[in-house]
Amino acid sequence: MGLFKKRKYITVSSKNLDENNDVENQPTIPDGMWIKCSKCGKILYKSDVDDNFKVCPKCNAHLRMNARERIEFIIDEGTFIEFDKNMMAANPLEFPNYEAKIKSMQEKTGLKDGVVTGLGNINGYKTVIAVMDSNFMMGSMGSVVGEKITRAIEEATERKLPVIIFTTSGGARMQEGMFSLMQMAKTSAALAKHNEAGLLYVSVLTDPTTGGVTASFAMLGDIILAEPKTLIGFAGRRVIEQTINQKLPSDFQTSEFLFKHGFIDMIVERKELKVTLGNILRMHS
């Protein structure tokens, strides 16, 4: 019976395995050429997304922009003057590894902390602007973020100019404890004085705007705008559901939900933001 037993063979590929056809000779894809949409999951050319103001061309998801990108998009070219560029956080509570975390974020983002403030023109109208950056410790508000925003508001009050703040934040920065929480009161007090002077404050809510930022300056605007599908809230959805023992609507804490319930004034597509802000400044100039 052994004569009829099926023999075992080793399959040898006929593909040329010559060293000249090594991996180095195969086509390569440059790093950073593709990006995956965080909403629909589609793989997209990064250049197409960048050319579309970082909006997904497939599902219209407004992907996150960093502070420098947003300033370049919103402010007229050559008019931006930055405030307090080199202000850096201390570690007043001696929180373990906080300095190392800050340094790591600075190297990653090119920023000293989570907000960029300054003076510039939007369609020819001068304004003070503050733009938060979620790439820097999720835009958390510590002493530097609060101080820079407060100084920007005070500068606007002194110059009798409007203020525009683009918010994106996970809330207060836990590493700074009470020093972080007091920024809520400080920024709000500065805005109160700005308001008493009869000046305009426009708040633009971008994804995500949560925690202490929502509970302070983000919701104090004379006019409150938001990008589509922006997450806006104070406590997290799961915490609220567990507290009230109820299931929340699927669109809860979205800009659309808040607009429907009167908490924000307008939802604006990103590509229309500069025109919209320019028109608001023109009407109030």
From Swiss-Prot:
Cofactor note as given: Binds 1 zinc ion per subunit.
Compartments reported by the entry: Cytoplasm
Segments traversing the membrane: none
Domain of life, per lineage: Bacteria
Residues involved in Zn(2+) binding: 37, 40, 56, 59
Keyword Chloroplast: no
Domain CoA carboxyltransferase N-terminal, residue spans: 33-285
Catalytic reaction equation(s): N(6)-carboxybiotinyl-L-lysyl-[protein] + acetyl-CoA = N(6)-biotinyl-L-lysyl-[protein] + malonyl-CoA
A single GO BP: malonyl-CoA biosynthetic process
GO MF assignments: acetyl-CoA carboxylase activity; ATP binding; carboxyl- or carbamoyltransferase activity; zinc ion binding
Cross-referenced SUPFAM superfamilies: ClpP/crotonase
EC number(s) recorded for this UniProt protein: 2.1.3.15
One Gene Ontology CC term in the entry: acetyl-CoA carboxylase complex
Keywords tagged on the record: ATP-binding, Cytoplasm, Fatty acid biosynthesis, Fatty acid metabolism, Lipid biosynthesis, Lipid metabolism, Metal-binding, Nucleotide-binding, Transferase, Zinc, Zinc-finger
Zinc finger boundaries on the chain: C4-type: 37-59
The keyword Metal-binding appears for this protein: yes
Protein function: Component of the acetyl coenzyme A carboxylase (ACC) complex. Biotin carboxylase (BC) catalyzes the carboxylation of biotin on its carrier protein (BCCP) and then the CO(2) group is transferred by the transcarboxylase to acetyl-CoA to form malonyl-CoA.
Family per similarity comment: Belongs to the AccD/PCCB family.
Name of the protein: Acetyl-coenzyme A carboxylase carboxyl transferase subunit beta
The organism's taxonomic lineage, starting at the top: Bacteria, Bacillati, Bacillota, Clostridia, Eubacteriales
Gene designation per UniProt: accD
